[in-house]
Amino acid sequence: MIALFPNESKDPSLKIAAEICQFLISRNIEITAEDKHAKQLNVFPLSQVNVQHINFRISLGGDGTILRLIHKHPTIHAPLLGINLGSLGFLADIPLDGIFPSLEDLIKGRYRVQKRMMVEGSVLCKPSCFAVNEVVIHRAQNPCLIDLAIYVDGNYLNTFSADGMIISTPSGSTAYSLAAGGPILTPELKAFVLTPICPHTISNRPIVLMPEISIQVKYLSSYAPVEVSSDGISSFSLSTNEIFHASISSQTFDLVCLERHDYFATLREKLGWQGKLKI
């Protein structure tokens, strides 16, 4: 069974979803979709399906669509194939003209599953959170820099005066962390990237940490609470002297990578790398 997740805010998404349904049903593959789309697509409503029977998820949208569906349906762990109807698309990297050849590859087993690490975090007496890309501690409505003390396995690292701090996974290294000056990590690497956001001190650079460690972030400034957000979707507040704890999650994000997939080609295309300068 395949779970199909169109993003109705993308104009062609539902039309393409209907075409995908026809393609898969003609090959005797059962399909489910969220209840609001199931009737329109004439497939099984997700609320009536045992999620353990779902073999694959297919997302139609961009990377944001993938992140939202992971947070909305945390109990569905089937590998995910992302069809790109958005802009950059590092996670959703199947182009429109490659949809049906890619589905054929999926059906015939011409793929592998990347188990990408996730980060989980918690604050005392507050619900825990998880993220595929990153957890961000941000100054929120505070109009000035905030002070964040960072500890690694309880050992003091540094106090950063900045707009905030990004705790990124390798998947997230091409997202917010990259925009803030962080390095690119290949997606199956296991590591954290700590990337300060607009630090006051130029020498405060991003740092890559091994995944087995735990990270503690203490909010030192006597200002309004700051915001802790996971993948830009869910968030909660962190008050002065509260400590946010982050570590590798026991859960992974399983992404379908077709045999034809070339991560470095994706990097070149999405980041506009042109190779050697021609003079």
Curated annotation (Swiss-Prot):
GO MF, one annotated term: NAD+ kinase activity
GO BP: NAD metabolic process; NADP biosynthetic process
GO cellular component, one term: cytoplasm
InterPro entries given in the database record: ATP-NAD_kinase_N, ATP-NAD_kinase_PpnK-typ_C, NAD/diacylglycerol_kinase_sf, NADK
Annotated localization: Cytoplasm
UniProt cofactor(s): a divalent metal cation
SUPFAM superfamilies: NAD kinase/diacylglycerol kinase-like
UniProt-listed Enzyme Commission number(s): 2.7.1.23
Active-site positions on this chain: 63 (proton acceptor)
Leading EC class: transferase
Binding site for NAD(+): 63-64, 68, 133-134, 163
Any single Pfam family the record assigns to this protein: NAD_kinase_C
Record's keyword terms, sorted: ATP-binding, Cytoplasm, Kinase, NAD, NADP, Nucleotide-binding, Transferase
Catalytic activity field: NAD(+) + ATP = ADP + NADP(+) + H(+)
Main location group: cytoplasm
HAMAP family (alphabetical): NAD_kinase
Family: Belongs to the NAD kinase family.
Function according to Swiss-Prot or TrEMBL: Involved in the regulation of the intracellular balance of NAD and NADP, and is a key enzyme in the biosynthesis of NADP. Catalyzes specifically the phosphorylation on 2'-hydroxyl of the adenosine moiety of NAD to yield NADP.
Protein name, as recorded: NAD kinase
The species this protein was found in: Protochlamydia amoebophila (strain UWE25)
